């Protein structure tokens, strides 16, 4: 027995440096299925919706998948739908901590003189960022847009430069902004496709904006200024979460509408509708088509525990394995039963491992086609066995051997 113990101890001491300092490399990248704004070729444009608007698009918010199009790249005047980008930049400035909701924003002479829809700000009048956002989202206040642009960037011109830079970053290749509010100006144009892109960025990554865009009626200035939402779908369409209307004599009637039912969030954009009513009818047709024909399956949730596994040379019995991010799969209704998952672990997984270190991947398939994936991570730091761990095992082994 003593000889066996001495032999095992010698092996432990010889191998211990290797155990302590072993280094393993893992790939960070994973295959993605939802390349934003990628056409879902199997199901888009299968029906004719007979839309009255000149241009339109229906997009799944979660994946960016396009579900229906009509002249989606036609460059048209956006009118106040321009404000989707203005609102996006405001929300991003809030996220970065550059401004706060309670900050007071002054109205300049230029902002006061803005025409079109407004709340009639007086020069030097101060409203909070929260109040400005409410006025922009609910009644499309041009004066508040200019005041916010000056507050964030120093001038509307500088702010518009940021709008165009952000549009380029988002891949909005049909777009050129000339102002922050959407009043007609030669060359100020975009497309239904690009509006869907920026609407998705705003709605998906800044869901707090829905607290403003779903307001039907409210007030400012201690109740003296009544606000009624220009987007009638907020009141009359089940699940509507926003987003922005726009109209001028040249642009006619535009709308970017967002809605959510169950786990499916949709973006419907219509441009150059002949009348206000027809734009809302067209958006309703698009949304109805989407909700009737598609579903979004949450296959894997972020940080979901998939299983517990043993790790070679680990000082603990088992380790929880979690997912890195959500995996949502958009599919035609009835196809949910054809979704399956497959877990693949990296080769030679050994301790030590850092907390949330990647050790594998979970692939998600729809009709045997890879459509989604996320990394598998360890849910704790995993240390290598040390000499004391081996000694403890040795003692247990020796005890069992001697019985």
Regions found by a protein language model. Give the residues of each.
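Hydrophobic core
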Residues: 9, 13-17
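Active-site-adjacent loops and short helices of periplasmic peptidoglycan-processing enzymes
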Residues: 21-206
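Domain-terminus/edge residues, biased toward the C-terminal soluble/receptor-binding domains
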Residues: 172-176, 184-403
């Amino acid at each position: 027995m003593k000889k066996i113990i001495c032999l095992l101890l010698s092996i432990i001491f010889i191998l211990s440096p290797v155990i302590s300092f072993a280094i393993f490399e893992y790939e960070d990248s994973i295959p993605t299925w939802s390349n934003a704004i990628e056409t879902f070729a199997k199901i888009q444009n299968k029906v004719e919706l007979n839309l009255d608007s000149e241009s339109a698009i229906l997009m799944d918010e979660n994946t960016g998948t396009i579900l229906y199009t009509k002249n989606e790249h036609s460059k048209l005047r956006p009118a106040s739908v321009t404000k989707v980008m203005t609102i996006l930049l405001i929300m991003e400035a809030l996220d970065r901590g550059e401004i706060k909701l309670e900050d007071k924003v002054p109205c300049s002479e230029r902002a006061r003189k803005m025409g079109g829809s407004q709340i009639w700000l007086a020069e030097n009048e101060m409203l909070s960022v929260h109040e400005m956002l409410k006025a922009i989202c609910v009644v499309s206040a041009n004066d508040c847009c200019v005041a916010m642009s000056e507050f964030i960037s120093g001038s509307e011109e500088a702010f518009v430069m940021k709008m165009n830079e952000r549009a380029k970053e988002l891949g909005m290749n049909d777009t050129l902004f000339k102002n922050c509010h959407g009043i007609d100006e030669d060359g100020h144009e975009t497309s239904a496709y690009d509006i869907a892109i920026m609407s998705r960025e705003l709605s998906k990554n800044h869901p707090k904006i829905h607290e403003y865009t779903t307001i039907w009626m409210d007030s400012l200035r201690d109740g003296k200024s009544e606000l009624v939402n220009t987007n009638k779908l907020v009141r009359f369409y089940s699940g509507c979460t926003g987003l922005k209307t726009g109209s001028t004599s040249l642009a006619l009637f535009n709308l970017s509408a967002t809605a959510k039912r169950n786990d499916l969030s949709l973006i419907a954009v219509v441009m150059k509708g002949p009348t206000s009513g027809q734009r809302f009818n067209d958006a309703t047709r698009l949304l109805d088509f989407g909700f009737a024909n598609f579903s979004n399956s949450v296959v894997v949730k972020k940080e979901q525990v998939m299983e517990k596994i043993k790790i070679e040379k680990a000082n603990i019995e088992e380790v929880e394995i979690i997912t890195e991010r959500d995996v949502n799969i958009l599919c035609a209704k009835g196809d949910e039963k054809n979704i399956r998952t497959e877990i693949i672990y990296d080769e030679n997984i050994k301790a030590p491992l850092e907390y949330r270190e990647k050790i594998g991947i979970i692939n998600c398939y729809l009709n045997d086609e890879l459509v989604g994936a996320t990394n598998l991570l360890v849910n704790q730091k995993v240390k290598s066995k040390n000499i004391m761990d081996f000694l403890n095992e040795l003692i247990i082994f020796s005890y069992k051997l001697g019985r």
